[in-house]
Curated annotation (Swiss-Prot):
Residues 127-145 have a biased composition (Polar residues). GO terms for molecular function: sequence-specific DNA binding; zinc ion binding. The gene is gtaW. This is GATA zinc finger domain-containing protein 23. It comes from Dictyostelium discoideum. SUPFAM superfamilies: Glucocorticoid receptor-like (DNA-binding domain). It comes from the Eukaryota.
């Protein structure tokens, strides 16, 4: 029941019974009313247009005067103007309502975006603070306290002169298609073969004396220089720009042909056709199709 002693409780009970309408609900309700009125005006206008000829016929039959006909036409025109004016006012009101709704929606979206941006920035700050605190509280490891090593990476363990073992020497017999990479110390690191080859490696173990070690290292460096000088290999292929006949830029296999005493690049179909019909016939450069080559 409604408590009349307390005004706040009375308002609370009334709000429970009669819910408060929001601006959006009121606007949508008014928009529905405007659309109903516009529809009614259009219906009345259509009725006037459809029945005006009946009024004219009735005036001519009953009165037979052009003066009365002029009055009837004036009344119809005034009625139509009134309908137009009412519709124009309703359209303006409808436009105003839609503009206000759009503005309210835009403000709401901007407010939500601002709130989400501030929340994201706050969360990023919290995360960065947690990371900083974690880094500060992290204990030092034993590796961090170890001083850097004074030995260089290129240093080698010292051995007695009489016990020093010479570096091994490797001789490789290869075919022209083999590619051998050697280090500056004379050791063979990589061996890449493009065709089948017989490779024989002989390793000579040197004596333990200093003089023998010196001669072996000199011989190894000389052999490395000789081997690197004798390197031979097929040069890398240069991809042709286009076919001499059909101007094709891509093919599975490039062939050669002689035109005007010069070697020209041909695609696979044009090269096969060239080999079939003769190598020394002139082919016109203006042909674009391989079906009418050498015709």
């Amino acid at each position: 029941m409604v408590k009349r002693n307390n005004n706040n409780s009375i308002n609370y009970e009334i709000n429970k019974i009669i819910p408060v309408q929001t601006t959006k609900d009121i606007n949508s309700k008014r928009e529905k009313e405007i659309h109903v009125q516009i529809k009614k005006i259009n219906s009345n206008r259509t009725f006037v247009y459809e029945n005006i000829h009946r009024h004219i016929l009735l005036v001519l039959e009953n009165f037979g005067s052009t003066k009365n006909l002029f009055l009837v036409l004036s009344d119809c025109l005034a009625t139509l103007k009134g309908y137009d004016s009412q519709e124009y006012q309703l359209q303006l009101e409808l436009q105003t309502i839609s503009d206000s709704t759009t503005t309210t929606t835009t403000n709401t979206v901007s407010t939500v975006a601002t709130a989400s941006t501030s929340k994201t920035a706050t969360s990023k700050n919290v995360i960065s603070n947690i990371e900083n605190n974690t880094n500060k509280s992290q204990p030092l490891e034993s590796n961090d306290l170890t001083p850097p090593s004074s030995k260089s990476s290129n240093s080698s363990p010292s051995t007695s002169p009489s016990k020093r073992v010479s570096k091994s020497k490797t001789r490789v017999t290869k075919k022209p298609n083999q590619v051998i990479s050697t280090s500056s110390s004379g050791e063979t690191e990589n061996l890449t073969t493009t065709s089948t080859a017989d490779t024989t490696a002989t390793t000579d173990t040197a004596d333990t004396t200093d003089g023998t070690n010196t001669r072996t290292s000199n011989t190894s460096s000389d052999d490395t220089t000789t081997e690197s000088t004798k390197k031979r290999g097929r040069p890398s292929k240069i991809q042709p720009d286009s076919c001499y006949v059909c101007r094709r830029t891509f093919t599975s296999y490039w062939r050669k042909g002689i035109f005007n005493d010069q070697n020209e690049d041909l695609c696979n179909p044009c090269g096969l056709n060239y080999l079939k019909k003769g190598k020394k016939e002139q082919i016109s450069k203006n042909q674009n199709s391989i079906h009418n080559i050498l015709n």
